[in-house]
Every structure is written in structure tokens, then in C-alpha cells.
């Protein structure tokens, strides 16, 4: 069962994540971070960047692996996740760009039709993560339908990094990043699978707003199901879900989650 932390706002959630990761880097200078795009992690990255600066933490050895990438977008496209990760994480934290990887790096705009190259990219990415020693902390957002990464409802809970077709709702949701033109949104992606994500030693999922309330309810208190991919976190030995009041509004046991978090010993961390 994941630990549920209910916070006032995104800034408070960001501070919790930032402290967790900063302490990890101090203890393990070559820590491997799992990175995600989207709006949910932004406050977390900002909080971590501030701690790194204020405490003069050496991040030169830190490594990173992103969750996913569109297929067909060149790395230089402003909405490629390669560009987004470098803009929101690598530059603010001062990470070494050569040590931060995105599943589509080896593709760099390769079209979906180039099956020989596209099909090999997923397994190669999983091997790269394993060669780095695995991911220490993986940050996650969640879609309104319970997807994590680009693992849409129906994704195998044992899946590795592979090519997926984007759900129409996901393309509609992401059109805001493409001048509100769904025709510009790629139709396919390469994403870490649920099986890959579950290998990370610590998962931290962030969710904010009433629009995420149903997905959080299904993730935490619903049954384990491929139709809510995030529900796989119920089976992880060290998962933390940080939500604001609105995202937690449908949780039946939220009073217990608050009590458990406020009464845990400080040395346990998250």
C-alpha cells in the first residue's frame, strides 16, 4: 500500500519531493533519477533546484532517465520530451546533459514506419537503465484515466519500454502544447512500461486538482487493474502518493492517511 500524503498545494508537495531527492543525492552523488514531464512535477523540480542551490549540492554525478517520448518529433522540437526535460530539469538543476536520457534519444525524429529502428529502442532503453544500476527515485504524474507515462488503460502491468498508440483523449489533452491543434500531436510514443517503472526503488506520484480525484480514488482504493495503470503502485514496496485536498476528495480513508503521516517518526522520511 502506498503512503498517502495530503498537502495544501503543489508548493508543499514540491518541498517534500525536493527534500527527499536532495538528501538522496547527498548520500549517493551518482543517484539515478526517474524524470517525468507535464505540469504536476514542475513545482517539485523547482523546489529541488532551490535546495541544490541553497545547500550547494554537487549534482555533477547525477544521472536521469525520462519516462517517455513522442515518436516522429526531432529532439530539437520544443515539445519533444528531450527538449522539455532539458528545459525544466537539466538546466535549472545544472545536471550534466550527457547523463540525462530520454527513450527517443536514439530515434531523433525517426518515423514510425522505420520499424527496425523503432522496435529496438525500447529494449535498449531498459538495458541502459539496468546498466546504470536502476532508478533510485521515479517521479510520476497521473492522467485523468489513471495512465502513468504513456501507459494508457489496458496496458500490461508487466510491460517494458515499448511503442504505444496514444489514446485520443491523451492527444486532445496534449493539444494545448501544440497550438491547440490535435493534428500536430503525434499519434504514437515510446514509453517506459509499468514493469519498468515498478523496478524503481522509490516511486513518488503527484496529483493535484479535482480532475484527478477519480483517478486517485481508483489508484489507491480501487482494485488492481490494467484499466487503471497507476493501480500497480499498490504492489510496490516503496511508493509515495502526494495529493492536494481536491485530488484526495474521493478517498474514503483520507482521515487515516492524514493521521498516519502526521504521526510517523521523522527518521522514516518518505
UniProtKB/Swiss-Prot annotation:
User: What domain of life is recorded for the organism?
Assistant: Bacteria
Q: Which residues form the signal peptide?
A: none
The chemistry this enzyme catalyses reads: alpha-D-glucosamine 6-phosphate + H2O = beta-D-fructose 6-phosphate + NH4(+)
Q: Which UniProt keywords apply?
A: Carbohydrate metabolism, Hydrolase
CDD domains from the entry? GlcN6P_deaminase (cd01399)
Task: Quote the EC number.
Answer: 3.5.99.6
Q: What are the protein's GO molecular function terms?
A: glucosamine-6-phosphate deaminase activity; identical protein binding
Q: Where is the active site?
A: 68, 145, 147, 152
Q: What class of enzyme is it?
A: hydrolase
> One biological-process term from Gene Ontology?
N-acetylglucosamine catabolic process
One Pfam family name is Glucosamine_iso
Q: Which Gene3D superfamilies match?
A: 3.40.50.1360
An annotated GO cellular component of this protein is: cytoplasm
Q: Which InterPro entries match?
A: Glc/Gal-6P_isomerase, Glucosamine6P_isomerase, Glucosamine6P_isomerase_CS, NagB/RpiA_transferase-like
The pathway entry for this protein reads as:
Amino-sugar metabolism; N-acetylneuraminate degradation; D-fructose 6-phosphate from N-acetylneuraminate: step 5/5
User: Per its UniProt record, what PANTHER family does this chain match?
Assistant: GLUCOSAMINE-6-PHOSPHATE ISOMERASE
Instruction: Tell me, in a sentence or two, what this protein's role is.
Output: Catalyzes the reversible isomerization-deamination of glucosamine 6-phosphate (GlcN6P) to form fructose 6-phosphate (Fru6P) and ammonium ion.
Family the entry assigns: Belongs to the glucosamine/galactosamine-6-phosphate isomerase family. NagB subfamily.
Q: Which HAMAP family match?
A: GlcN6P_deamin
Name this protein carries in UniProt: Glucosamine-6-phosphate deaminase
Q: Which organism is it from?
A: Bifidobacterium longum subsp. infantis (strain ATCC 15697 / DSM 20088 / JCM 1222 / NCTC 11817 / S12)
Amino acid at each position: 500500500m502506498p503512503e498517502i500524503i495530503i498537502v495544501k498545494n503543489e508548493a508543499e508537495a514540491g518541498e517534500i519531493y525536493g527534500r527527499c531527492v536532495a538528501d538522496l543525492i547527498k548520500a549517493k552523488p551518482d543517484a539515478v533519477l526517474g524524470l517525468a514531464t507535464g505540469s504536476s512535477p514542475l513545482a517539485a523540480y523547482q523546489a529541488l533546484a532551490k535546495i541544490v542551490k541553497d545547500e550547494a549540492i554537487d549534482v555533477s554525478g547525477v544521472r536521469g532517465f525520462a519516462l517517455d517520448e513522442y515518436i516522429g518529433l526531432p529532439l530539437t522540437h520544443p515539445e519533444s520530451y528531450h527538449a522539455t526535460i532539458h528545459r525544466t530539469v537539466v538546466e535549472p538543476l545544472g545536471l550534466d546533459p550527457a547523463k540525462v536520457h530520454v527513450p527517443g534519444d536514439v530515434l531523433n525524429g525517426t518515423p514510425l514506419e522505420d520499424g527496425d529502428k523503432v522496435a529496438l529502442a525500447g529494449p535498449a532503453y531498459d538495458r541502459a537503465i539496468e546498466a546504470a544500476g536502476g532508478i533510485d527515485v521515479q517521479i510520476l504524474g497521473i492522467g485523468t484515466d489513471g495512465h502513468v507515462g504513456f501507459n494508457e488503460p489496458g496496458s500490461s502491468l508487466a510491460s517494458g519500454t515499448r511503442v504505444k498508440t496514444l489514446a485520443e483523449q491523451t492527444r486532445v489533452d496534449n493539444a494545448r502544447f501544440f497550438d491547440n491543434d490535435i493534428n500536430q500531436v503525434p499519434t504514437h510514443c515510446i514509453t517506459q512500461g509499468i514493469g519498468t517503472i515498478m523496478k524503481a526503488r522509490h516511486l513518488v506520484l503527484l496529483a493535484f486538482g479535482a480532475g484527478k480525484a477519480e483517478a486517485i480514488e481508483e489508484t489507491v482504493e480501487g482494485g488492481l487493474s490494467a484499466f487503471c495503470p497507476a493501480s500497480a503502485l499498490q504492489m510496490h514496496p516503496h511508493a509515495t502518493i502526494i495529493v492536494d485536498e481536491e485530488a484526495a476528495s474521493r478517498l474514503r480513508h483520507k482521515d487515516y492517511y492524514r493521521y498516519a503521516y502526521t504521526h510517523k517518526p521523522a527518521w522514516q522520511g518518505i
